[in-house]
Structures are given as structure tokens and as C-alpha cells.
């Protein structure tokens, strides 16, 4: 089978994308036995979902690109997606889920438009003609479009790995040096 889109990583970004890709055959490959481990840990288990004031200057990278992304997906649009959950605005205009991070993860899973494959650690990827081939320990997946949403290097105990960096390097994508960050 050839998927329209394969997403590597069932964290916040991968699950959010999978829930919003409609009308396509989508798969998510997750190396852990369950999705969203970092979601469950975020905000002390209360999941700080977004901030009221989000600006490109708060991010490292190409400012114009970041500005375009923030225009496409604003904090209000994120809150609208999660509108069936109740959020409280707290210190520094942060939004926390009143019913906890498990509710956020549950909603992301409920709204999935993707087949999620657990225990599928990605070992590498290559492009053959116009098709990406994604290799796991026991299976090969094929797709027309590949999204790397494997997260950063923090919280190795929750499944963090450098697979996204390796795949990006294999495809000649220039990477910025990683730096520690604190979300405020």
C-alpha cells in the first residue's frame, strides 16, 4: 500500500496533523507502545496547550517562515480545535486544560484520520522515484509525502530520539544547531 502521507511521531504535532488531514490515506508511525507521552507530561499533567500571545520572535529559525505558520495556525484556531474541552487562562496568558492532559490526548486520538502503528521505530528513509520508503525494524512503509514530527531531543525517558535529525540530514536538509529552550 502507498499512503498519501506518513507522519513519523505520534506526539502533539503528529497527532494534530493526523487529525486535520481529511480525505487522504494517512499513517502515523510511533516508536513507543502508546501515543502522546510528552503530552501527558506537559504542564505538570494539565497540558499547557497554547499561549494567548505567540510571536515569531519567540522562536529560533527563519522568522518569515515562522510568521507564515503562525498566520495559518493561530492560538485561537488551536483553542477552536479543542473547543469541546474546557481551558483556563493562567499566568502569562497560558491555556491549561481543566480536565488534564489525558483529555487532550484522548481528543486527538478520537479525531484521528490516520492509521496509527505503534512500536514502529523508524530506522531510515529513502526516496525511490516519487515515493518515500520508510524502514522500521520489521516493516517497510511507502508514501507520497513524508512528515517528520518526531520531536526534539529532550525527555529521552519519554521516547525522544534523533531520528528526525538523521532523516533530515539524509535528505540534505540544513539543520540549525539545537539549543535548550524554556517555554514561558
Language-model features, listed with the residues they occupy:
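Residue-level signal for inorganic ion chemistry
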Residues: 82, 108, 168
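Predominantly flavin-linked oxidoreductase catalytic cores and closely associated redox partners
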Residues: 34, 111-184
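N-terminal Rossmann-like FAD-binding beta1-loop-alpha1 element of flavoenzymes
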Residues: 3-28
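Short beta-strand to alpha-helix junction loop
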Residues: 66-74, 91-110, 117, 155-163, ...
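Short beta->alpha hinge that forms the Motif I/post-I loop of the SAM-binding pocket
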Residues: 31
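Redox-cofactor binding/interface segments in oxidoreductases and associated redox assembly factors
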Residues: 8, 41, 148-149
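Glycine-rich active-site loop/strand segments that organize a redox cofactor
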Residues: 44-91
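A short alpha-helix-loop-beta-strand transition element characteristic
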Residues: 35-41, 69-74, 85-95, 172-182
Amino acid at each position: 500500500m502507498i499512503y498519501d502521507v506518513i507522519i513519523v511521531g505520534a506526539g502533539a504535532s503528529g497527532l494534530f496533523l493526523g487529525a486535520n488531514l481529511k480525505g487522504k490515506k494517512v499513517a502515523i508511525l510511533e516508536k513507543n507502545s502508546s501515543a502522546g507521552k510528552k503530552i501527558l507530561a506537559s504542564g505538570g499533567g494539565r497540558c499547557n496547550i497554547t499561549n494567548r500571545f505567540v510571536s515569531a520572535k519567540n522562536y529560533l529559525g527563519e522568522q518569515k517562515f515562522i510568521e507564515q505558520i503562525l498566520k495559518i495556525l493561530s492560538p485561537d484556531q488551536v483553542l477552536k480545535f479543542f473547543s469541546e474541552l474546557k481551558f483556563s487562562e493562567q499566568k502569562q496568558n497560558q491555556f491549561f486544560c481543566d480536565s488534564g492532559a489525558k483529555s487532550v490526548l484522548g481528543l486527538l486520538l478520537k479525531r484521528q484520520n490516520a492509521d496509527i502503528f505503534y512500536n514502529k521505530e523508524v530506522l531510515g528513509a529513502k526516496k525511490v522515484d516519487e515515493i518515500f520508503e520508510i524502514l522500521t525494524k520489521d516493516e517497510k512503509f511507502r508514501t507520497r509525502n513524508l512528515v517528520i514530527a518526531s520531536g526534539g531531543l529532550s525527555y529521552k525517558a519519554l521516547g525522544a530520539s534523533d531520528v528526525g535529525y538523521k532523516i533530515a540530514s539524509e535528505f540534505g536538509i540544513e539543520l540549525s544547531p539545537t539549543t535548550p529552550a524554556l517555554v514561558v
